[in-house]
Amino acid sequence: MSYPIERVRADFPLLASEVNGQPLAYLDSAASAQKPQSVIEREAEFYRHEYAAVHRGIHTLSAQATSAMEAVREQVAAFINAASVEEIVFVRGTTEAINLVANSYGRTFIQPGDNLIITEMEHHANIVPWQMLAEARGVEVRVLPLAEDGSLDVAQLPGLLDERTRLLAVTQISNVLGALNPVKTMIAQAKAVGAVTLVDGAQSIMHQTVDVQDLDCDFFVFSGHKIYGPSGIGVLYGKRDLLQAMPPWEGGGAMIRQVSLRTGTTYADSPWRFEAGSPNTGGIMGLGAALDYVTALGREEIQRYESSLMKYALEALKQVPDLTLYGPAERHGVIAFNLGQHHAYDVGSFLDRYGIAIRTGHHCAMPLMEHYGVPSMCRASLAVYTTREEIDRLVAGLQRIHRLLGS
C-alpha cells in the first residue's frame, strides 16, 4: 500500500497556508514540526472540558485529570519501550532534561578529576550544561571528533574512555548533518568502563523507532514539539534505579513526601521527585495525541517514506550549481547546505519570498560550524507531510537564486 501523503497533509491545517502569496512549503520540521488536527483538538478539549489541577485533588475533575496525565506517562513508556512507567519524567523539553541530568546526576556522582565525553556534532543543549558542570566541579570534557565524511570518528572513542570516565552524552541523529550515530555500540563501549550514557533523541524520535532497552542507555531525552506535539513538553527517560539514586533538581510542590520546619524535607520517589510545581497538563495531553498519531501512521511506514524522500531530495539537489552539501552520504531527516559564497541568511530570505521555509544560521551547533569553517548553513528538513513537489520547489528556488546572484 502506498504512503497516504495527501491524507497526511490534510491532517495538518497549517500546511494549507500561503506565505508571500505562495503555497507554503514547510521544510523546517527539524526546528519544530507542525501539529495535526488531532493534537490541536486534544489539547483544546482538555482545557474546554477536563481541566483541573492534578495530584491530591479529591474532586472528580482533579482525579480524572491526574489519571489522564498518568495514562500518557504509560503511553510514553510503551512508545520508547521503557521497562517501567516510573522511568518517565515530564519536563519542558530536551534542554531541561539534559540540564536536569547534569545538575542532579552530574553534581552528585561526577567528582573533580573525572571526565565526560560529548561529540563535535552536538547541539548546544548537549554541550553547555556539561561545560557548566565541568567548570563547577573541576571535570574534564572530552570531545569525540568528526571523520572526514561527516560521520562521527567512532574509532577514536576507546582512546577517550578510561577509568575516570563517568558519562557519555551523544546525539542519536545530528540536527545539522542528519548523521545516524551508532549509539548502541558507543553505549556498550562506555559501559565497559563503568560510564553512564545519555542519548539526545530530539531529532531521532520523529524519524526512528526508539527502544531504550535495546539501546541500554541510562538516559534518553526528547521534546514533544519535534514529534508533532505541543511546545513546552518533553521527556526524560532514566533507568529507575539511577533516577531513584539522584537528588531532586528543583524544589516545590508535588515532588515531596513530607515537609517539616523541624526535621526537614523528604522527597517523593522518581519520577515525581523531578516534577516540582504544576505540570503542563495540556501539553502532556497533546503529547499523548501526537504519539497516537505517529503510531497510527506506523513508524516503519514513516521511515520507509522519509528514506525514499531523502534519496529523491539528494538526487534532485545535484541539479543546483555551486551547492555544497554537509554531512555523510547517508542522512536522516535533514539536509545542510550552502549555495556558492552566499550567506545562508540571504539564501533563506530569497526562498521565503517563494513560500519555502527553511532554517538558516549555526543551528545551535557552533563547534560544528567551526569544524567546517563556515559561519552558518542552510538546512532543509523532512517530515511525515513533506512531498516531492516541495523538494522540487526547493531545487527550483535555489536554481533561481543562483541565476540571480551567481556563485
Swiss-Prot record:
Cofactor needs: pyridoxal 5'-phosphate
Subcellular location: Cytoplasm
Pfam families: Aminotran_5 (PF00266)
Record-linked Gene3D superfamilies: Aspartate Aminotransferase, domain 1 (3.90.1150.10), Type I PLP-dependent aspartate aminotransferase-like (Major domain) (3.40.640.10)
Catalytic activity reported: (sulfur carrier)-H + L-cysteine = (sulfur carrier)-SH + L-alanine; L-selenocysteine + AH2 = hydrogenselenide + L-alanine + A + H(+)
GO biological process, one term: cysteine metabolic process
Active-site residue list: 364
Positions where N6-(pyridoxal phosphate)lysine occurs in the chain: 226
SUPFAM superfamilies, per database record: PLP-dependent transferases (SSF53383)
Annotated GO MF terms: cysteine desulfurase activity; pyridoxal phosphate binding; selenocysteine lyase activity
Enzyme nomenclature, EC number: 2.8.1.7, 4.4.1.16
Pathway: Cofactor biosynthesis; iron-sulfur cluster biosynthesis
Listed GO CC annotations: cytoplasm
Quaternary structure annotation from Swiss-Prot or TrEMBL: Homodimer. Interacts with SufE and the SufBCD complex composed of SufB, SufC and SufD. The interaction with SufE is required to mediate the direct transfer of the sulfur atom from the S-sulfanylcysteine.
Similarity comment: Belongs to the class-V pyridoxal-phosphate-dependent aminotransferase family. Csd subfamily.
Physiological role: Cysteine desulfurases mobilize the sulfur from L-cysteine to yield L-alanine, an essential step in sulfur metabolism for biosynthesis of a variety of sulfur-containing biomolecules. Component of the suf operon, which is activated and required under specific conditions such as oxidative stress and iron limitation. Acts as a potent selenocysteine lyase in vitro, that mobilizes selenium from L-selenocysteine. Selenocysteine lyase activity is however unsure in vivo.
HAMAP family xref list: SufS_aminotrans_5 (MF_01831)
NCBIfam families found in the cross-reference section: PRK09295.1, sufS
Name this protein carries in UniProt: Cysteine desulfurase
Species lineage: Bacteria, Pseudomonadati, Pseudomonadota, Gammaproteobacteria, Enterobacterales
